[in-house]
């Protein structure tokens, strides 16, 4: 289901893509934006499992992140996130 896909951990997804935080607290991390890689304007809330890119003015769930990172639509993002090689929430 879509709700199950949204539970995929954004932090683990970014780590699997080789994207690590520039600054981190127990509840969130600041990253170089995977959408617009110029400054550490990309925030991930680890508690809510949501992201926001202050430079691009966009944010949302892991589905939205995949859509923006790969310039694909909603259905393609769902298919992408259903790949067995991706990190899953236990």
Language-model-derived ranges and their functions:
Residues 1-90:
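N-terminal structured subdomain of primase-like DNA metabolism proteins
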